[in-house]
Amino acid sequence: MPAMECVAKKFLKLPNIQKYEVSALTEYGFVAAIEMDDGFEFKIHVYTMQKSYPSSVMQLLEKRGKDKGDCVLVSPYISKRTADICEKNGVGYFDYAGNCWFVGHSIYLSERGNKNLSPERSIASTSIFEQSAVISSLILRELFADINKVWRLKHLSETVKCSIGQVSKVMDFLIKNAWAEKSAEGYYISEPELLLKEWSKTYGKKTVPTYLCYSLDNPSVLEGKLSDLKRDMGIDYYLTGFSGGVRYAPVVRYNKVHVYIAPEDMLEAVAYLGLKEVDSGANVMIFSLENDSYKKDSRIIGEDMVVSPLQVYLDSMQIKGRGEEIAEAVLLKEILK
């Protein structure tokens, strides 16, 4: 049995372990008895899971108090989120790739970085955060419009104008990963910051079609010309990245402009603004406004159209340098308020 083997192998490699043996099989896994070289004996209660969702670990923690002895989770694949929950709560873990963590009884086991050949990422887990998943994106954006709001599935589906099935799929995934919870009143986001960080990782794996341009104007002058572009040509634009972020939280100085413009307006906008397309050294990034989710909850700040704090966060997390700094500032000031 792989679960038994991967735990036994790690413990028996330790020089201070005299004996390790499985003493009982249980409905959840097995119990192993361990004897150290000084004669001290203890037991570990090993829970085996084919899929170790963070929510499953939360349930394991509830059972933990009923068992006398140390608690250990074994699964083919253990995500970083699951590992963090285990470590925070003193639960050991082992996966089939050899990654592990166990602390107790003068024992410290820790091994990370072994690549799992078949990481547990279902189609649903990847598609929910991808830029092409427009409906899922709209559902998530509605949830983040007010992270303190509790939703009924029917109300959320009506608000987003999608099926209850689509909403249910998203909420089930969030609950499995312990980012959302269900109460008697409905569903709500319980770990907004962790959820956003995971979303931003997947979001950044696909690059939005971008015009890389150079302008002789400084950012403030160019952003003023964008306002003129709207007035003179009727072309909508939405500031994001540094340009959008400082409108919400002016914590960084910047020399690059980030803006969304519809793909059909790109060439006309570039010509009006007097920009030159370049392969390197760009100080203007024009992102293609491919779908309406990017501009959901956008607002007018001063004379400029600015994407939502959520979109600023997602875009800024992909910017090298001080992008994460502006993203974090917007997160704290506008999203987690």
Predicted regions and their residues:
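DNA-contacting interfaces and partner/effector-binding or oligomerization modules
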Residues: 1-91
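C-terminal regulatory/effector modules of DNA-binding transcriptional regulators
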Residues: 24-29, 35-36, 154, 279-337
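Charged, structured surface patches that assemble and position nucleic-acid processing machinery
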Residues: 90-102
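Short, charged, surface-exposed secondary-structure boundary motifs
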Residues: 103-107
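Short alpha-helical segments that sit at the start of domains
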Residues: 110-140
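Loop-centered beta-sheet repeat module
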Residues: 139-199
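A compositional/biophysical signature of low hydrophobicity enriched in polar/charged and small residues
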Residues: 196, 202-208
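Short gly/ser-rich loop at a beta-strand->alpha-helix junction or flexible surface loop bordering the NTP-binding
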Residues: 206-292
